Design a protein with these regions (language model features):
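A composition/biophysics-driven feature that prefers long, compositionally simple stretches
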Residues: 1-177
């Protein structure tokens, strides 16, 4: 089943999930999660896209080449998404993209940036943070972006146990979809 339009789940549910993640994060930390990318089958034909389950669980967003950044400081919590910008030519062939301008409202996040700006924006957003929740080797394209951003953290934690535990318990909306 394609996760694309299981968005029979209200956006508030994804927001609540992110709030539960924030509650488990330590202050002055960030959680970074990358989406899947499109996988080429041959020449100009891709395999059907399937979103990363963890990324979809926190965003409900079904486009490739995106990243979710959750930032928790002593003062505030912020959800930021990096995604592909709109491209009318490519959208003619591959379907509409959400785009940076509409992402904050549609995904209920605080800020949105082009994924092309990750290397410059990620260091600015995380410069005063001391810890990162991240799973290395899950998405090599994302690990490369992270390495190129040249941000160093005092501690790195694995987010997978936290999110896996959360995903065990299904909401009434999820049960209805099963």
């Amino acid at each position: 089943m394609d996760l694309a339009y299981m968005a029979a789940l209200p956006q508030e549910e994804f927001t609540e999930r992110r709030q539960k993640v924030f509650a488990q994060m330590q202050p002055n930390s960030a959680l970074l999660l990358f989406s899947e990318i499109e996988k080429r089958r041959n020449n100009d034909c891709d395999f059907p896209f399937r979103q990363d389950s963890y990324f979809w669980y926190l965003t409900g967003f079904n486009e490739p080449n995106a990243a979710l950044l959750l930032i928790k400081t002593e003062e505030a919590e912020k959800a930021v998404v990096f995604l592909r910008p709109r491209d009318p030519l490519l959208e003619t062939w591959n379907g509409r993209r959400l785009g940076v301008e509409r992402a904050p409202q549609k995904l209920n996040v605080d800020e949105a940036y082009s994924i092309d700006d990750f290397k410059t924006e990620f260091p600015k957003l995380t410069e005063k943070l001391t810890a990162l929740y991240h799973v290395a080797d899950r998405h090599p394209w994302g690990d490369k972006l992270l390495a190129e951003s040249a941000v160093k953290f005092y501690a790195v934690f694995d987010w997978q146990p936290m999110l896996s535990e959360m995903r065990l318990i299904k909401s009434p909306n999820e049960i209805r979809l099963m």
